[in-house]
C-alpha cells in the first residue's frame, strides 16, 4: 500500500506537478490534492491507487516496501 508521502516524494523526484500527475493517471486534480493531504492509511478506491502507482512507475519511479526501515520511493535504475 502506498502512502501520501510516497506519492508526494515520487512527484518531487520527477519534478511533476499535481496537475501533471492527475493527467498522467487520468484522475482529477482534486483527487490528487485530497489523496496527498491524507494522513495514515489511504482511504481511496483501489483503481484510483492503481492509476497513480502505474503513472508514477511508467515515469521511472520505484516504490520501496517497508522492510524495517520504512517505506520509500526512488528513481528506478536503468
What are these regions, as identified by a protein language model?
Residues 61-78:
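Helix-turn-helix/homeodomain-like alpha-helical modules used for DNA recognition
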Residues 7-20:
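Short basic helix-loop element that most often maps to the first helix and adjoining turn
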Residues 39, 46-63:
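DNA major-groove recognition helix of helix-turn-helix/homeodomain DNA-binding modules
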Residues 27-44:
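Recognition helix of helix-turn-helix/homeodomain-like DNA-binding domains
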Residues 10, 24, 35:
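Residues in the recognition helix of alpha-helical DNA-binding motifs
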Amino acid at each position: 500500500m502506498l502512502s501520501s508521502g510516497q506519492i508526494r516524494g515520487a512527484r518531487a523526484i520527477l519534478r511533476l506537478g499535481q496537475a501533471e500527475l492527475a493527467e498522467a493517471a487520468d484522475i482529477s486534480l482534486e483527487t490528487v490534492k485530497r489523496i496527498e493531504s491524507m494522513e495514515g492509511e489511504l482511504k481511496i478506491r483501489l483503481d484510483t491507487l492503481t492509476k497513480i502507482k502505474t503513472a508514477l512507475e511508467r515515469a521511472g519511479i520505484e516504490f520501496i516496501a517497508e522492510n524495517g526501515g520504512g517505506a520509500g520511493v526512488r528513481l528506478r535504475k536503468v
